[in-house]
């Protein structure tokens, strides 16, 4: 991170204070105690407004990171990590006027820019997933956070199944720093399949993909937020995206004849669906048709062959994930 240290006399909530910038933190000290914000872990963006510097933050609910010398370390990475967060603006009134406010805003912006955060995002919003409220969630919770962070967005509402895959397969990735899926796990899978079907897939797969839990199944978002030591919520997922938090994932490839499908979460054999469809001719039997079909027609002639390749070193990890109760919480 760029070392852009500075000190200034300010007023916070009407009280005089000394503000310091350095070591990746913004601190201000006054009679009531000291307060600090981690630029990387807690600050969304900064704005100069007259002689004021408005620091847009996303802090652990209930407190800023430091309220007194004894409380130091209770924020990101300390006891506050993993708690729910909330939006809050901190206003520093510069004693030296508007020029100082502009200078400090520029310093803070340079520091934030050194973290490699995304500036341009392409966002898929699935209006049909979950409770069908993804668009409302985007307008009420997601857009305000991106606006506060100064992130430019292009929004695409999906109109039918497979739409996200089609768009991802031809999207001009040079225009964006990442893709965000406001949906459940389905749109994420579509985007991955669209990317891996491109002729330039080896380069395109490097594009970061963010996931916001707004669908029926949100296993991937929960898993990624858990690894980032954050509570699973829409706002926390957006903040992780704004911060540029990344984690590499394995991709599973399923080939059946000339068909190829890619998965990043799970893959199952649709046995139950087969039984439901094929036992339709025994509907007159009621619910007993399922058992009857399995015993008389499926098991006697069941013959399936497949080749499974897996690294032995990850088998134990897979078993742990499958047995993690909170994984699908």
Where are these regions (language model features)?
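ATP/NTP phosphate-donor binding region
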Residues: 1-182, 189, 193
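Active-site glycine-centered loops adjacent to acidic/histidine catalytic or metal-binding residues
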Residues: 126, 185, 213-215
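Catalytic core of DAGKc-family lipid kinases
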Residues: 158-160, 166, 173, 189-329
